[in-house]
Regions:
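Conserved, single-site charged/polar hotspot
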Residues: 1-253
């Protein structure tokens, strides 16, 4: 049963063109979590894209599953909780800043490239702002269609601005969105202020300043969900505000 689940998880998570040599390491790295206490799979990022055992698989996924049968990635006697993302934005984030408050020595912040240039201290707002507004060299900073077709399914390739992206809201859109997603009435949104960033520049805590209420939210996923009808690609973002000439207190967008 477990191997059957892995076959169908690997298929939606990776294209049929994915290099066979990389699939075994992908399986060992990710799909080796300890069993949930009360159920086998969850709908969170922990279990990725499990879509049922009847979901079509690929020969590559099937071969990789059987080639890695019984293999797990360990650290000091425990199975590694080795999360991953399709695009890190140029820098890895430390585990505790995105998920549970547990610091894993094998999941640390570092640069996603071969360059010897040291990763800036992206916990500092000035450095994070500069980093996010530029496009540093990184393995995931590519528009090479041949490379992308090997690692992403067709529907994932529809997103072309995954490395650096932009979202724009009017005052009304933003205030209504935050109210709907958080269940809290902030009134008009005056500002979104970074309170804490992780080692990759991702926001861990964000202060929402409204005309009726001010509140700090976090962590990373809550911030992404609050500021989008689904979720933002990342919490590694900076905010620019625009004002109308006759209104300098509250941004128009």
């Amino acid at each position: 049963v477990a191997n059957g689940k892995l076959k169908v998880i690997m298929h939606p998570d990776n294209t049929a063109n994915f290099e066979l040599s990389t699939l075994p390491s992908q399986l060992i790295k990710w799909y080796d979590h300890e069993t949930h206490k009360n159920f086998d799979v969850c709908a969170d990022d922990h279990c990725q894209r499990y879509q049922g055992i009847t979901r079509a698989s690929t020969p590559q996924a099937i071969e990789a599953v059987f080639a890695t049968r019984g293999e797990v990635l360990m650290y000091e006697g425990e199975i590694c909780d080795a999360r991953f993302s399709k695009c890190c934005g140029g820098a890895f984030e430390e585990f505790q800043n995105c998920w549970e408050n547990v610091k894993h020595p094998y999941l640390i912040g570092q640069r996603d490239s071969k360059t010897e240039t040291r990763l800036p201290d992206l916990t500092k707002e000035a450095e994070a702002d500069k980093w996010i507004r530029t496009s540093p060299t990184a393995f995931c900073n590519t528009h090479n269609k041949q490379v992308l077709s090997q690692v992403l399914n067709n529907y994932d390739q529809e997103t072309t601005d995954f490395y650096r992206w932009r979202v724009c809201y009017s005052q009304q859109e933003l205030s209504e969105l935050i109210h709907k997603r958080s269940g809290i009435e902030f009134g008009k949104i005056i500002d979104l202020i970074p309170v804490e960033r992780g080692t990759s520049g991702r926001l861990v805590r964000l202060k929402i300043v409204g005309t009726l209420r001010t509140l700090i939210i976090g962590k990373e996923l809550e911030i992404r969900r609050t500021l989008s009808s689904s979720h933002l690609y990342s919490s590694a973002f900076v905010v620019d505000k625009e004002y109308k000439e006759d209104e300098k207190e509250i941004p128009s967008r």
